[in-house]
Amino acid sequence: MNKINNNLEFNGNEDEHFIEYYNNKNYKSDLLKANKNNKTKNKKNSNFNFKSIEKNRLNYNNKKNKFILNRKAYYNSNENINCQSDIIYVEENITVNELASKIGVEATEILKVLFKKGKLLNINQILDLSLLNLISQELKINITTIDKKNNIYINTESNNDQNINDKHVKLRAPIVAVLGHVNHGKTSLIEKLIKNDLTKAETGHITQHIGAYEFIIGPKDKKIILLDTPGHEAFESIRQRVLKISDIILLIIAADEGI
């Protein structure tokens, strides 16, 4: 701790601006003017008044500190999204707008990401697992979907190598979708497998709905779920729904019909 003229104590590390002023060539003239004014006002007090200088210095430091705090708050609020350590849990069938609220970004930012990947959506459209995975990779966030019905958590990160406990994994019958053009024998093949006459119950012997059948195979009576689909062009949306839930796709092409 140092002293100047035994009037003001200061810390050399904190009062650089004051030291500059002290070393300035105009300091002596300022000192003389101040002493002259003090003598005029009060002859008993001939000391230089450091209080006003100290007050100005403190005001300057306060403004500077306030600016630094505001700047830190600004940059913290505008940081890039980085949720690698945190997991964002979302429910199935979440919309773009709902996901944006969960992440804390504008819905337009998510739409931009999807648009760059050739996906044209609006804020009210539902995001499937593949789109959530795409958003997760582009925004570098960890999104996990929650299947409340089966109490399953699905992590969308493709590079996430989490250890799965076999005790919590339930075996289920694989779902096989049977696809093909109309009159190529999809339903006829299924009825041979399940030993049931299905075509007689169909209008015009043409499948116009999704048919689900259980097929037993192997010595241990393992089950396979067969999904029969309509082959007509008008039922494209039905086939798309089947594709989303299927594990295996079986494409049927009749040899006598050709491709």
Swiss-Prot record:
GO terms for cellular component: chloroplast. It comes from the Eukaryota. Residues 171-259 form the tr-type G domain. The keyword Protein biosynthesis applies. The lineage of its organism: Eukaryota, Rhodophyta, Bangiophyceae, Galdieriales, Galdieriaceae. This is Translation initiation factor IF-2, chloroplastic. One of its GO terms (molecular function) is translation initiation factor activity. Keywords: Chloroplast, GTP-binding, Initiation factor, Nucleotide-binding, Plastid, Protein biosynthesis. Belongs to the TRAFAC class translation factor GTPase superfamily. Classic translation factor GTPase family. IF-2 subfamily. GTP binds at G180, H181, V182, N183, H184, G185, K186, T187. InterPro entries: IF2_N (IPR006847), P-loop_NTPase (IPR027417), Small_GTP-bd (IPR005225), T_Tr_GTP-bd_dom (IPR000795), TIF_IF2 (IPR015760). SUPFAM superfamilies: P-loop containing nucleoside triphosphate hydrolases. The gene is infB. It is found in: Plastid, Chloroplast. It holds the Pfam family GTP_EFTU. PANTHER family: EUKARYOTIC TRANSLATION INITIATION FACTOR 5B, TRANSLATION INITIATION FACTOR IF-2-RELATED.
